[in-house]
Structures are given as C-alpha cells and as structure tokens.
Amino acid sequence: MWKRIECLAIYTEDIEKSVNFYQSLGLTKVWETYQDEEKQWSLVGMRFPDGNSEVVLKNNPNLNFAETEIAVEDVKGFYEAFKTNLEVEWIRTPFPNSLGGHVAVMKAPDDNVFVLVGK
C-alpha cells in the first residue's frame, strides 16, 4: 500500500538557476544523479527543512511535467498485487532505480499518473 508522498518532481530548463532559487526558499540540495546512461539529463534532490519530503528538479524536455512520487514498501509486490486490476494502466513496470530500490509508473482510474518508489 501507499506510505507517503516521497517527492514532487518538476521540470526546469536551468538546473543550477533552480537549485539557487529553491535554496533561497530554505531547501537543501541533498543529492544529484543522471536520469539516463548517457548522462544527458540531470536529477537533483532538494529537501525541505523538516527532512520529510523533497522537490526533485529534472531537465529532460521529454518529461516537462510534474510527477508525484509515492513511497511504497515493495514496488514489485505492489505491481504483482495490482497488475490484474483493469482500472490501472502500467506505463512502466518495475525497474531498478539508480539511487537504489525499484520504480514503477502507473495511471490511476482517474487518469492521474504516479511514480512508485521503494525496494
């Protein structure tokens, strides 16, 4: 089952400008990685002061929309439990996350898209 909202991933054309802006609002840059093997598209985690959630900055123009990431205990287990639910569309089945664990992407019956993250 869903545990919490992990982060909100948002698109930016200029990662460094956005990092500086969100730091001025009190967020802290806590990690940085690449979204692809070619190291063309960056992901930067900006943590809120209470440490419970993040804004993730991304610069991939093919993903220029907001994504809500939901933490689950076990991504593969969640997928197995819901893969036969005809109201759920699986955009991406579980795959390894470069930061550890797994990721899957689902579309809910109300057409909202959620990125599931966990082990």
Regions found by a protein language model. Give the residues of each.
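Short, basic, helix/turn surface patches
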Residues: 55-64, 117-119
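Short acidic/glycine-enriched loop/turn segments that link adjacent beta-strands
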Residues: 37-41, 63-64, 97-102
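Vicinal oxygen chelate
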Residues: 4-14, 25, 32-34, 60-119
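Core segments of cupin and vicinal oxygen chelate
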Residues: 2, 9-52
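Short secondary-structure boundary/capping segments
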Residues: 45-47, 59-60, 96
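Short, charged/polar, Gly/Pro-enriched secondary-structure boundary elements
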Residues: 50-55, 111-114
